[in-house]
Amino acid sequence: MKSLWLCWALWVLPLAGPGAAMTEEQVLSSLLQQLQLSQAPTLDSADVEEMAIPTHVRSQYVALLQGSHADRSRGKRFSQNFREVAGRFLMSETSTHLLVFGMEQRLPPNSELVQAVLRLFQEPVPRTALRRFERLSPHSARARVTIEWLRVREDGSNRTALIDSRLVSIHESGWKAFDVTEAVNFWQQLSRPRQPLLLQVSVQREHLGPGTWSAHKLVRFAAQGTPDGKGQGEPQLELHTLDLKDYGAQGNCDPEVPVTEGTRCCRQEMYLDLQGMKWAENWILEPPGFLTYECVGSCLQLPESLTIGWPFLGPRQCVASEMTSLPMIVSVKEGGRTRPQVVSLPNMRVQTCSCASDGALIPRGIDL
């Protein structure tokens, strides 16, 4: 079975782009932008020979240098596996429900979340209620269903984030699917021990105006199964994941092995020598150079049978999924005097390489 699986899979050639190494031009461009300059200044060696770097400036530089190894910016995301998690309605009002999903140990270790789908069973509207509604409100038969991620903060306050929203008809019934991938991404960012995943489901009027006030009151979602008592209508959370053992990157490249088309996605070390750049002379005081990295190699592609469900996703590519900043000490000339200044250039060094699909959602960070 394993050999058959590998026969289905494809390998793509390395692509230049998000995982490419930082170039001299990019460093210069970022530095000019940070200092709001149009071109690199020309400084004489006499301007910097006798200039001492104060202790507080060097301390600031060292602190940023240490922090750059801890602070990372993320960017990246299929499904070899999916799991269903049964949820329960914790609280129910006229048009709002709060779903609670126990998530611990639901996501396999060393896996990548591709998509999370919330499935709610819309119950059919009784015929008598439907006929009465059509007689009183003939202009609109739809309601808006909104899914929000709810976070309970340590101080007891609540914060919500909009996840998905769509219109449903009161004439329909059955399973409705909502994309809640971003909510699970938010949940994964919580510190341990994590609280359960809380999803707030709101049913509202389609729009303001006469004839629309009661449509949303007829939309009901099953909380404890279908009328047959088999529990098939309760809320379900499908988690689609990939095993990164097969579909992820391998970490750092082996320096003893040359990179080829068949090399699995990895981070390759490179050194950018700032001292050898004419424009940096007498301008950049620290560092003399720095280790930079690029993401090289190929990523295992999913067989067509698994990609049909996600037509919006392109091929999996080897890209930089985490970047760090690059602190520098530069010479700044003001009023005939030259002084040292610390700057930090964001997203200048590749920290982690990953296999990600073109077109996949870039997870937002929690800002609630």
Curated annotation (Swiss-Prot):
Keywords from the UniProt entry: Cleavage on pair of basic residues, Cytokine, Developmental protein, Disulfide bond, Glycoprotein, Growth factor, Secreted, Signal
Propiece span(s): 22-77
Signal peptide: 1-21
Highest taxon above the source species: Eukaryota
Gene3D superfamilies, A to Z: 2.60.120.970, Cystine-knot cytokines
Post-translational modification: The processing of the protein may also occur at the second R-X-X-R site located at AA 132-135. Processing appears to be regulated in a cell-type specific manner.
Localization annotation: Secreted
InterPro entries: Cystine-knot_cytokine, LRDF, TGF-b_C, TGF-b_propeptide, TGF-beta-rel, TGFb_CS
A GO MF label: growth factor activity
Pfam families for this protein: TGF_beta, TGFb_propeptide
One cellular component (GO) term of this entry: extracellular space
Glycosylation sites: 158
Disulphide-bonded residues: 253-266, 265-318, 295-353, 299-355
SUPFAM superfamilies: Cystine-knot cytokines
Keyword ATP-binding: no
Task of the protein: Required for left-right asymmetry determination of organ systems in mammals.
Similarity comment: Belongs to the TGF-beta family.
Protein name per the record: Left-right determination factor 2
Native species: Mus musculus
